[in-house]
UniProtKB/Swiss-Prot annotation:
Gene from which this protein is expressed: uppP
NCBIfam families, sorted: PRK00281.2-4, undec_PP_bacA
Protein name: Undecaprenyl-diphosphatase
GO cellular component terms, semicolon-separated: plasma membrane
Main location: membrane
Organism of origin: Aliivibrio fischeri (strain ATCC 700601 / ES114) (Vibrio fischeri)
UniProt cross-references to Pfam families, sorted A to Z: BacA
One GO process term, biological-process aspect: regulation of cell shape
Catalytic activity: di-trans,octa-cis-undecaprenyl diphosphate + H2O = di-trans,octa-cis-undecaprenyl phosphate + phosphate + H(+)
Mode of membrane association: Multi-pass membrane protein
Family indicated by similarity: Belongs to the UppP family.
Function: Catalyzes the dephosphorylation of undecaprenyl diphosphate (UPP). Confers resistance to bacitracin.
EC number: 3.6.1.27
Ranges annotated as spanning the membrane: 1-21, 39-59, 83-103, 111-131, 149-169, 189-209, 218-238, 246-266
């Protein structure tokens, strides 16, 4: 991997991780279309660290409040809306964690292909359009219930299918349940913290148990670039989502998926 490839892939990871357009698709496509070699386990860990740091630092006040309330609910049996939301985020993490443990190898072998990415990019883009068009946009994240959180957790589990988009499918599910765009995005981003932590820890453990050589310069590039791009992306997405809606991302997904289908048909 060259420094240009590291910069480009980290930039892609940062910008696409929290937009409803699928980060996995954008990381798979350069190798499929440009013939780049796989970025490797160490680089995967690096960009996970960068994007996780971005969302934790951006939501640092909310994270501290939720963690404090969550610990208080365990230690002091104190329950409030913050502790309730924290427990619901934990609940929403369980389906994806179980799905990952059970089906990760199957997905890696059979679904990590450009054809699957093209199909899911278009299908889930159209689903996002339909749901956003018909959404009531009335609830905030503190009106979350355990049934709604579990529904969002199942949606997050589906995001393991390449091209689906974790933020895309969870925001789609939240809009379907009647949440505002801002609340849907905030809960989706907060949901990402435990699942990215689990995924990064799993990859880090695999890396520690392997004999893979580590290039600190490339890894530093991955962490820094993915952090900066993810932080910027979160900031502007939350500021603009209410006014612009989901249509720009729907159009992008349809164009990307259609272009990929044409490219595959010609090759």
């Amino acid at each position: 991997m060259t420094y240009f490839e590291a910069f480009f892939l980290a930039l892609l990871q940062g910008f696409t991780e929290f937009l409803p357009i699928s980060s996995s698709a954008h990381l798979i496509l350069p190798s499929a279309i440009l013939g780049w070699s796989d970025q490797g386990l160490a680089f995967d860990v690096a960009v996970h660290v960068g994007t996780l740091a971005a969302v934790v630092i951006y939501f640092r006040k909310e994270v501290v409040t939720l963690l404090t309330a969550w610990v208080g609910s365990i230690v002091k049996k104190e329950h409030n809306k913050e502790s309730n939301l924290a427990w619901l985020i934990v609940l929403a993490t369980i389906p994806a964690a179980l799905f990952g443990l059970l089906f990760k190898d199957f997905i890696e072998i059979y679904l990590r292909s450009a054809w699957v990415i093209a199909a899911t990019t278009i299908v889930f883009g159209l689903l996002l359009w339909w749901v956003d068009k018909n959404a009531t946009l009335a609830k905030d994240e503190y009106q979350m219930t355990w049934k709604k959180a579990l529904f969002l957790g199942i949606a997050q589990a589906m995001a393991m299918i390449p091209g689906t988009s974790r933020s895309g499918i969870t925001i789609t599910a939240a809009l379907y349940l009647g949440f505002t765009r801002e609340a849907a995005a905030r809960f989706s981003f907060l949901m990402s913290i435990p699942i990215i932590t689990l995924a990064g820890s799993y990859l880090g453990l695999k890396l520690a148990m392997s004999d893979i050589s580590i290039h600190l310069g490339l890894l530093s590039t991955g962490v820094i670039v993915s952090f900066i791009s993810a932080y910027i992306c979160i900031h502007f997405f939350l500021k603009l989502i209410s006014s612009m809606g989901m249509m720009p991302f729907v159009i992008y997904r349809i164009l990307l998926g259609s272009s990929l289908l044409v490219w595959l048909a010609l090759h």
